[in-house]
UniProtKB/Swiss-Prot annotation:
Single GO MF annotation: glutamate-1-semialdehyde 2,1-aminomutase activity
Lineage start: Bacteria, Pseudomonadati, Campylobacterota, Epsilonproteobacteria, Campylobacterales
UniProt GO cellular component terms: cytoplasm
Claim: Lipid biosynthesis is one of the keywords in the record: no
HAMAP family per the UniProt record, alphabetical: HemL_aminotrans_3
Keywords linked to the UniProt accession: Cytoplasm, Isomerase, Porphyrin biosynthesis, Pyridoxal phosphate
The protein's name: Glutamate-1-semialdehyde 2,1-aminomutase
Amino acid sequence: MELLHSINDFNEAKQVIAGGVNSPVRAFKSVKGTPPFILKGKGAYLYDVDNNHYIDFVQSWGPLIFGHADEEIEENIINTLKKGTSFGAPTELETTLAKEIISCYEGLDKVRLVNSGTEATMSAIRLARAYSQKDDLIKFEGCYHGHSDSLLVKAGSGCVTFGSPSSLGVPNDFSKHTLVARYNDLNSTEECFKKGNVGCVIIEPIAGNMGLVPAQKEFLLGLKALCEKYQAVLILDEVMSGFRASLSGSQEFYGVVPDLVTFGKVIGAGLPLACFGGRAEIMDLLSPIGGVYQAGTLSGNPLAVCAGLSALYKIKRDKTLYTRLNALAIRLTQGLKKSAQSYNIALETLNRGSMFGFFFNENAVCDFDDALKSDTEMFAKFHQKMLFKGVYLACSSFETGFICEPMTEEMIDLVVAKADESFDEIIKGV
């Protein structure tokens, strides 16, 4: 396999696009490689400008549960496109999509459509602060909630210290109200509650940006109880896990009903769409009814709404979809682990529905500190081997992989065989 055209394209892109990419992870920096420049996608496959094709486990970082260029979704988008791309006015499609989302998630009375997960979490936090009338928020190490300033923070020397910016350009004043707790650690979380005037807590119930690390059930139930004890708004960030892990997102596994929730990715089926929602008494604080301002020129645009609605209709029609996707994810993760073990390579694997992850780590990963102990050099070698064997994996050991509906057992078995070849070559130093 060669990437000559991709190398040339990347060099050209770096002359006119900052870093050569429009989202940092796409640069393949952490795996010391060159990103293939993609020409098209179809089903489970990506095709690049060098005429290479790959089985794609990134799926645009999660949205494409039905794979690339699904014919039904594509046809509906084209029909909607002919009527106009954006109106900046209400449409019936928006109401229909809102009803479909609400019907799948307990405790969800109303939603507001936005364009990205970052907008959704940013707006949900603003709304939660207004409702609680308290400024401080708790987030968790390793959980990613978009790139708004108050959420780009990391823990200091201890989990109960106020956050400090982890990105240049973020003033301390923007992050001083953010406290960072240890994921899956209730003691750390309660210390944050005691230290600050906490109005809301935001968490990924199934974390996807430190690798795949699900919350422990007793932890999430305990977190809900702490929010009730300290009268704080609980926000579940299901931008990644919503309609991915199951039809009801994390609720399938935990049964936790939040005050607010955010969705994205799958509900846009590959077009820019996200939402936040929750109890009516909180959501009614939003303008134009209440005093919490949130707006967007392209929010609820008909193309994205149509794509998302088409995906949700397909999901609801297919009663065995999540069972099949889960089975494929288990087949993949178990196959990878068995192969690694045969070469005495430490590998921890897991899945939640169609989401999967693996760590080159001797122990189970329960939080961000555990994830950081993983062998990232081994991951980089493995990633490059697999890429050149036609398997497109997330280009960071701290990302999550995704199964899509067009994938088959035969594809999974082929990928496991290629992983076995890769492990063999790594051990032999080839």
